[in-house]
């Protein structure tokens, strides 16, 4: 959708390194709150968790996760939405992941009365340095999660194809 592409372009243009995703987090929180989705923010960490409670009975919680940090690489792509931060770019698809999760948030929120149980949406900081998830786990924010899923864009996979990894 156009909204997902616009979010991806914004996030790509405003790429931030691990633990420095303040502008990214603020953008995600603002977009989620505009939809009406409750969002948990953290005073001591970047990233956020949105929670969508279904309108039907159910006691399971599913987590959908997207990473939000960028890499310390100078962008020379020439695209009109290239990173405005010198030496920092989304070269691994995290802008796409976060934008797609925002799109999923909208769809889930709009159909929440049909959902049984709860869906948590984790916009995870600091994935590129392999420690970002520990914060959310160690603080107990994911204790009620029964199943978790993430995704990653894969440039060698054909468009429209789903690749599942073990």
What are these regions (language model features)?
Residues 1-90, 99, 103-115:
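Acidic/His- and Gly-rich active-site-bordering loop/insert found
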Residues 71, 79-89, 96, 113-166:
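Histidine/acidic-residue-rich, glycine-tolerant segments that coordinate divalent metal ions
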């Amino acid at each position: 959708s156009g909204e997902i592409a616009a979010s991806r372009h914004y996030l790509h243009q405003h790429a931030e390194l691990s633990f420095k995703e303040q502008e990214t987090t603020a953008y995600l929180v603002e977009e989620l709150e505009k939809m009406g989705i409750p969002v948990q923010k953290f005073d001591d960490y970047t990233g956020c968790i949105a929670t969508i409670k279904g309108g039907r009975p159910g006691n399971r919680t599913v987590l959908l996760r997207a990473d939000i940090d960028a890499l310390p690489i100078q962008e020379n792509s020439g695209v009109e939405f290239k990173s405005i931060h010198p030496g920092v770019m989304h070269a691994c698809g995290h802008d796409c992941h976060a934008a797609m999760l925002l799109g999923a948030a909208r769809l889930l929120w709009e159909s929440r009365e049909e959902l049984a149980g709860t869906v948590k949406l984790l916009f995870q900081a600091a994935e590129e340095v392999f420690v970002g998830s520990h914060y959310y786990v160690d603080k107990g924010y994911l204790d009620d999660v029964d199943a978790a899923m993430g995704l990653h864009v894969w440039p060698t996979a054909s468009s429209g194809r789903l690749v599942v990894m073990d």
